[in-house]
């Protein structure tokens, strides 16, 4: 997907990028490739692949109408090089983005990226989701949590749901259909007082399969969740 094809798809969805936004995506691509030489950020470095499999893929929740350009508080868990939240922030500057990542080198990259892109309303924290999920500053404070190819729902639910306000939404993006995964996650979702409201398969413009799952939080999370770092992965609910 060339940058021009990317812009055209957005126009077809009613979004026309300004010159500033186009430049932000261009700078994002350049910094991603430069920094990838120093730290492992992505296996995808070809320009057209980055625009398709990182930029376009990241904005799926916007293109499908699940996020609008309003002062939503969004937490991105395990964003790596900033996906999906930074492309969404470029598109919709009104949203407020927080990223938690367990690798400090990636946080350093994100700080430089945000500075170069002149983004405001972005916050980056180094650490484990399990630890932040028990911190009152972060717990039950977000409208939306996003996670792109982070973990199976059975594990992901415990890492993300505690951060949501009641009626907040987890938006999980994956490469493959998630039917079996959701069956395995039924107990975890019930324990965390949350339920699946959307589970939708779609395709990228090149035909690759993708899946978006949205989980809504119905009641406050029991205090004991998330359990200590590493436990959700080793002993899923």
Swiss-Prot record:
Q: Which GO terms describe its cellular component?
A: cytosol
* InterPro entries, A to Z: rRNA_ssu_MeTfrase_G (IPR003682), SAM-dependent_MTases_sf (IPR029063)
Annotated region (Disordered), positions in chain = 216-237
Q: What is its main location?
A: cytoplasm
> What EC class does the entry list?
transferase
**Recorded GO MF terms:** rRNA (guanine-N7-)-methyltransferase activity
Give UniProt keywords alphabetically.
Answer: Cytoplasm, Methyltransferase, rRNA processing, S-adenosyl-L-methionine, Transferase
Positions annotated to bind S-adenosyl-L-methionine: 78, 83, 129-130, 148
Coiled-coil ranges (or none): none
Where would you find this protein in the cell?
Cytoplasm
Gene3D superfamilies the record matches = Vaccinia Virus protein VP39 (3.40.50.150)
**UniProt record similarity statement:** Belongs to the methyltransferase superfamily. RNA methyltransferase RsmG family.
NCBIfam families noted in UniProt:
rsmG_gidB
The protein's job, in short, is: Specifically methylates the N7 position of a guanine in 16S rRNA.
What's the protein name? Answer: Ribosomal RNA small subunit methyltransferase G
Species assigned in the record: Streptococcus agalactiae serotype V (strain ATCC BAA-611 / 2603 V/R)
């Amino acid at each position: 997907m060339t940058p021009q094809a990317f812009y055209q798809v957005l126009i077809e969805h009613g979004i026309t990028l300004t010159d500033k936004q186009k430049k932000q995506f261009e700078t994002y691509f350049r910094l991603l490739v430069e920094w990838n030489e120093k730290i492992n950020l992505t296996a995808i470095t070809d320009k057209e692949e980055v625009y398709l499999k990182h930029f376009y893929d990241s904005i799926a929740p916007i293109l499908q109408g699940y996020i609008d350009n309003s002062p939503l508080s969004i937490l991105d868990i395990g964003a790596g090089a900033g996906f999906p939240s930074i492309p969404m922030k470029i598109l919709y500057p009104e949203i407020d983005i927080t990223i938690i990542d367990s690798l400090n080198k990636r946080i350093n990259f994100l700080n430089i990226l945000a500075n170069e892109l002149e983004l405001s309303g972005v916050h980056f924290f180094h650490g484990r989701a399990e630890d932040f999920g028990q911190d009152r500053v972060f717990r039950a404070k977000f409208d939306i949590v996003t996670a792109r190819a982070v973990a199976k729902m059975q594990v992901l639910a415990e890492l993300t749901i505690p951060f949501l306000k009641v009626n907040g939404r987890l938006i999980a993006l994956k490469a493959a259909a998630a039917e079996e995964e959701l069956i395995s996650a039924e107990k975890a979702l019930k324990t965390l007082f949350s339920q699946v409201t959307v589970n939708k398969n779609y395709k990228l413009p090149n035909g690759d399969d993708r899946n978006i799952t949205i989980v809504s939080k119905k009641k406050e999370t029991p205090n004991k969740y998330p359990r200590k770092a590493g436990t959700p992965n080793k002993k899923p609910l």
